[in-house]
Regions:
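Solvent-exposed, acidic/polar segments of extracytosolic/periplasmic ligand-binding ectodomains
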Residues: 32, 339-419
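Extracellular/periplasmic ligand-binding modules, especially the Venus flytrap/periplasmic-binding
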Residues: 187, 232, 237, 283-341
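Sec/Tat signal peptide C-region and signal peptidase I cleavage site
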Residues: 21-28
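Beta-alpha junction/loop-to-helix N-cap segments that form part of ligand/metal-binding clefts
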Residues: 31, 46-51, 61, 65-136, ...
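Extracytoplasmic "Venus flytrap"
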Residues: 35-56, 76-83, 105-106, 174-182, ...
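Bacterial N-terminal signal peptides that target proteins for export
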Residues: 1-13, 21
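Periplasmic-binding protein-like
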Residues: 92-105, 125-127, 172-175, 201, ...
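Extracellular/periplasmic Venus flytrap/periplasmic-binding protein
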Residues: 87, 131-133, 142-246, 281-290
Length: 419
């Protein structure tokens, strides 16, 4: 073969290679498999629906990708039961081969799933299901769990301080009798008594209580206010039955009492009631207004904290995956990266402390009936009346001293002023 023939052959080969290269499909995005646990049936079903909608809305906004990875979202119904949550988590890990678990609702579910994550070395982002000791005394046992929203006592510490600032001296406490109720109420009691207030009574109705008739007559009359912590349908029934029984004094509550998952179903009797949380759909910022309008258009209701928390969880996963080029790095490297990210979230600035628990603004909110965000109808909204910025799970307490005390429970703090 002469030199000219060789040159022709080389040109043909090069042209063919270039054509083949240009015709090759783009590299497919990495797959990120997420196991999402939430109640879709049972008394907590609406909470689970809000959770799923918040997470899905972020996914839809980002064309089903987080940080460049194509998301496969596998949703399992835990029915609001910790034992069912464990069964579903095992299925997601062992059969579905997910990269991470997200969700759960009850604090008791958080306590149940954290050991599963440790045993299987599986990242677990407890977007809702969380509990104080998972980020406190038991933190070292559960290095694979992240709490991107809060722990139960975190919003109630500032509310205890706020109650003192209002001049309240004597308060009765009534809370659902399980971990979330104990820890939320305990945080309020400690902060309130540390600034001079007195909890004079503690009442513990079982979780899921519908009839508060046996409890209402026992509430003391010589008090300045009630602190209540209710969850699920309890949140709707308690204030209605309390007001019907003639109680007219202030009601203070945990955020789940008046959260937007239930607020639209309440009547005007809750106007003026106060609660504390890290989110309100009435947060008057351009970012939240846009979020509320988009969510309401998509799902026919205003977003709840269950919605926002899971939207923000998806945002945090997105930002973390971006820093790893869309490739899941494994649970501990993922957590290390996530811990270094400070989000400008819908609810405001949020970051993780050194024990993988969110640091948030905590908002004191009052139920008001008014128009917001251009809607032409008067509706119930949780108006923000005070902001406590950058609240950690340890509030204003020394962390080492705080960790030496027992976890908040039915018996701690002790009811030293009970009558």
């Amino acid at each position: 073969m002469n030199a000219g023939s060789w040159k022709s052959l080389l040109l043909i080969s090069a042209s063919a290679a270039i054509a083949t290269w240009f015709s090759m499909p783009a590299t497919a995005a990495e797959e990120l498999r997420i196991g999402f646990i939430a109640p879709k049936t049972g008394i907590f079903a609406q909470l689970g629906i809000d959770m799923q909608n918040g997470f899905q809305m972020y996914l839809d906004e980002h064309k089903g990708e987080l940080g460049g990875a194509k998301v496969t979202l596998i949703i399992e119904d835990d029915q609001g039961r910790p034992d069912t949550g464990v069964t579903k988590a095992n299925k997601l890990i062992l059969s579905d081969k997910v990269h991470m678990l997200v969700g759960g609702v009850l604090a008791t579910t958080g306590y149940a799933l954290a050991p599963v994550a440790t045993r299987e070395k599986m990242l677990y982002i407890g977007s809702i299901a969380t509990a104080d000791d998972l980020g406190q005394r038991d933190f070292e046992k559960y290095p694979y769990m992240v709490r991107p929203t809060f722990v139960p006592s975190q919003p109630s510490h500032p509310l205890g301080q706020w109650a003192c600032e209002q001049g309240y001296k004597r308060i009765s406490l009534i809370a659902a009798d399980y971990a979330f109720g104990h820890e939320t109420a305990g945080g309020f009691q400690k902060a309130f008594e540390d600034c001079g207030g007195k909890i004079v009574q503690k009442i513990w109705p079982p979780i899921g209580t519908k009839d508060f008739g046996p409890y209402l007559p026992t509430i003391k009359s010589d008090i300045d206010a009630i602190f209540a912590l209710m969850v699920g349908p309890m949140s709707l029934q308690f204030p209605k039955q309390l007001r019907a029984a003639g109680y007219k004094k202030p009601i203070l509550g945990g955020g789940t009492n008046y959260d937007e998952f239930i607020l639209p179903s309440m009547d005007d009797g809750v106007i003026g009631d106060v609660s504390s949380f890290m989110y309100s759909s009435a947060l008057d910022t351009p970012k939240n207004e846009a979020f509320v309008k988009k969510y309401r258009t998509a799902y026919g209701k205003v977003p709840s904290y269950y919605s926002e928390a899971n939207y923000t969880t998806a945002q945090w996963i997105d930002e973390t995956m971006k820093q790893h080029g869309g490739k899941y790095p494994g649970p501990l490297p993922f957590i290390k990266t996530m811990q270094g990210i400070k989000l400008d979230a819908i609810r405001g600035p949020v970051s993780l402390d050194d024990r993988l628990t969110a640091v948030n603004n905590i908002y004191i909110k009052k139920v008001e009936k008014k128009k917001m965000f251009g809607y032409d109808k008067d509706e119930l909204w949780n108006t923000v009346i005070k902001t406590y910025p950058n609240v950690s799970q340890f509030w204003n307490y020394d962390k080492a001293a705080f960790l030496k005390q027992p976890v908040y429970s039915r018996d701690f703090p002790p009811c030293k002023f009970c009558e």
